Curated annotation (Swiss-Prot):
Originating organism: Wickerhamomyces anomalus
GO annotation, biological process: cell wall organization; glucan catabolic process
Protein name from the UniProt record: Glucan 1,3-beta-glucosidase 1
MF-aspect GO terms: glucan exo-1,3-beta-glucosidase activity
Catalytic activity as recorded in UniProt: Successive hydrolysis of beta-D-glucose units from the non-reducing ends of (1->3)-beta-D-glucans, releasing alpha-glucose
Amino acid sequence: MLFNILILSALSLQLCTCFHIKRNLNGSNDVIWDYYDDSKKVQGVSLGGWFVLEPYITPSLFEQFGEDEKKIPVDEYTFTEQLGKDEAQKQLDKHWATYFTESDFKDIKDYGLNLVRIPIGYWAFYLLEDDPYVQGQEPYLDKALEWAKQNDLKVWIDLHGVPGSQNGFDNSGKRGNVTWQDDEENIELSYKTLNYIFGKYGGENLTDTVIGIEIVNEPFHSKLNETDMLDFYYNSYYDFRIKHNSRNFFLIQEAFEPIGFWNTHLNNDYTNVSKPFLNDELLEEGVPKNYFHDIVLDHHHYEVFSVDQLDKSENARIQDIKNYGESVAKEQEYHPSLVGEWSGAITDCAKWLNGVGTGARYDGTFDESQLVRTNAINGTAESQFKFKDKKRSCENVTFVEDFSKQHKENIRKFIEIQLLTYENSNSGWIFWNYKTENAIEWDFKKLVEHKLFPHPFNEYKYFYENGTQIVESAASGNPQNLLFITLSALLVSLSTLL
């Protein structure tokens, strides 16, 4: 037994260096936070559904419109449009005041987490003339920063939705067509919003709490003009560093670009890549030495938004995560990065996860055509549910009370391998989401309560710390098998270092 313990200890020590992150010498902001510090990873949660409504996070807000999904709002835009300004203001004032409170921040700290990512839409600060949105979120954002500071939590402020929608998802505030770049007014208001955020939240007075501002969440590069998108990133960086002289971290969401795409962008070592996107004013004044610094890349990774992903076996899903981690590890020398959204989901069965009226891929009811529906008021949209190729049922995989033992094990394994991989391959992780009303695969709090999320976070049941899976006989305590598996795992670990 003692020999086994010594072997395990040696294995853990070896693993500490498996994915050592190289330091990008352009970085200079260790005082605020060091994203290259292997001893202090980001371990965070998002506070989704608070300032940007998502039907699957808080379905009760949308269920008040009845059972006919043709008439249920699909996003915050149609929610406020359908209720009207006065009623929407009344309901959302209550929601903002109660959905997250000071006690949540204390609980988040008590769970051992160190960061919260706070999504917020442009409409919290400015409105287009015909916007139905209501305002009042900003005072609660300010309270959130106070609560975070009181509980020694760091904060990412994330501009989750921009005018016209950057991706067409309901989490951008407006589901349907991607029209962000179609109107110059949309772009101008996006810059105006960011400059307000940079000025108020990006200064040194908040660097003890805010350790990054994310300029736009999940712009869908394939549905955008990529050159214009890159212009927006570079111009926003100029505003951040030069106009506002911010020393904070500039966060870029990967825009669904392939891993490695951002290596040479916003990087002092690749001026030939950056130069076409630098504005004339900067070029005339002269680009400061080490102009690009303290830039962090935010990756989002899920395994449930395609039929191919859902059809994968448990082992294939686990291998996907390992491969993903290896790819992400290779980009660290260019920009530190972390996985800023991931979940425990191995199905897409949570009610309205894919959007109101769209069904689920898992059971064959998904109808992608419904994603372009933008007007829920007149009821003109057809509600089509496709039942072709129905192989599985969501009946026993939606609510934890119905989960089989095997399904629970599969979720726990999926979460464990992600924790292991994201801890070891980059600067950490931010789980989506801290809580929901009933979508447990996306609910950190419920997952921990039901022992589906390791707590403490390194309390692994199914994997050694190098990602080698523990076989059942070893886990059950058979000394000979345990020794054999442990030695095998050690050899695997050593081979990766040679």
